[in-house]
């Protein structure tokens, strides 16, 4: 009986030690990297970070020319009600009008968010999407999955 109890305890201990740790939540942080630029039409730029394949860690940073501050991981800060990162393997990013389109390859998504606030507007599913271009109010998306047709 003691041996059976010892075996059950050992199995329970192994199961508890095999549990995965909670994933870290990386909070955004800002650092001033240059002096503010005065009198420019360009307010700043977004940088899409690819992340590791299979880790769901594509992220978005923002550099503000008017303040000289670079903010890391702005997307998860501005969108706390959704998954903490953009997805798996960020591939391309484009601004069109008042929206930003981020192509997330392995997640099969194009994430659309507001250019001023970085708040997510919607996601568009495109299998194995890679790159994005705009011409005459149309978006063209390359995909390695064969023909793609998106009907809004």
Predicted regions and their residues:
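Bacterial Sec-dependent N-terminal signal peptides
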Residues: 3-6, 13-43
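A short beta-strand motif characteristic of beta-propeller blades
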Residues: 23-25, 69-85, 116-124
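Signature of short aromatic-glycine-proline-rich micro-motifs recurring in repeat-based ectodomains
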Residues: 30-31, 86-92
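Short coil/turn segments that connect the beta-strands within blades of beta-propeller domains
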Residues: 41-45, 97-98, 136-137
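Conserved beta-strand positions in repeat-built beta-propeller and related beta-rich domains
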Residues: 47-55, 100-106, 141-145
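Structural motif
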Residues: 54-61, 109-112, 148-151
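Short loop/turn segments that connect beta-strands within beta-propeller blades
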Residues: 65-66, 114-118, 151-152
């Amino acid at each position: 009986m003691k041996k059976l109890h010892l075996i059950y305890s050992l199995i329970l201990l192994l199961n508890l030690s095999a549990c995965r740790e909670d994933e870290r939540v990386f909070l955004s942080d800002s650092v001033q990297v240059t002096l503010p630029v005065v009198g420019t039409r360009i307010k700043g730029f977004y940088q899409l970070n690819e992340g590791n394949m299979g880790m769901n860690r594509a992220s978005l940073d923002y550099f503000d020319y008017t303040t000289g501050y670079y903010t890391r991981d702005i997307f998860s800060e501005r969108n706390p009600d959704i998954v903490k990162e953009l997805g798996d393997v960020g591939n391309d990013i484009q601004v069109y009008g008042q929206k930003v389109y981020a192509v997330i390859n392995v997640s099969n998504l194009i994430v659309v968010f507001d250019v001023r606030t970085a708040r997510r507007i919607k996601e568009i599913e495109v299998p194995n999407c890679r790159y994005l271009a705009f011409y005459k109010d149309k978006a063209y998306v390359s995909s390695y999955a064969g023909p793609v047709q998106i009907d809004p």
